[in-house]
């Protein structure tokens, strides 16, 4: 089933428009959308009910109301999420959280980043990398740090579309590629 991108943006923009734009509130909505995503992907009963064209709309609404009530979702956002089911677009629950996070990042001028290093990175080095990358791309970056011994040395830094690969592993691959041309 194909997902309608225009509908995605419309729903996300409506959610953002009808909510308090505090970081705390937007993070709460993001976590609710994460839970709906997980529920949609992992709970076959939930998925079958909201996607089944033969299930009554009343049953679908009751299910959504119970789930959203249990999650503590306010009335305005609940109406929007129930409208998704009424519009027969429930398949967007599996991706809605990603689009919402992207729009929230745009709203706050932040970018998710990742540092994959061959060794443990201390806080001072992380802050130094963060300040350099933020000055390069002009946005605030929230990094997740991972260790990967297969890099041998160095690191791979990703922030939005900005990628720096200084790992020994990639250097050796480039060297191998260059030498194999001769």
UniProtKB/Swiss-Prot annotation:
Membrane topology type: Peripheral membrane protein
A GO term, aspect molecular function: proton-transporting ATP synthase activity, rotational mechanism
Compartments it resides in: Cell inner membrane
Keywords of this entry: ATP synthesis, Cell inner membrane, Cell membrane, CF(1), Hydrogen ion transport, Ion transport, Membrane, Transport
Gene3D superfamilies with a match to the protein in the record: N-terminal domain of the delta subunit of the F1F0-ATP synthase (1.10.520.20)
Main location: membrane
One CC-aspect GO term: plasma membrane
Family label: Belongs to the ATPase delta chain family.
The protein's assembly and partners: F-type ATPases have 2 components, F(1) - the catalytic core - and F(0) - the membrane proton channel. F(1) has five subunits: alpha(3), beta(3), gamma(1), delta(1), epsilon(1). F(0) has three main subunits: a(1), b(2) and c(10-14). The alpha and beta chains form an alternating ring which encloses part of the gamma chain. F(1) is attached to F(0) by a central stalk formed by the gamma and epsilon chains, while a peripheral stalk is formed by the delta and b chains.
This protein's name: ATP synthase subunit delta
Organism encoding this protein: Sulfurihydrogenibium sp. (strain YO3AOP1)
GN (gene name): atpH
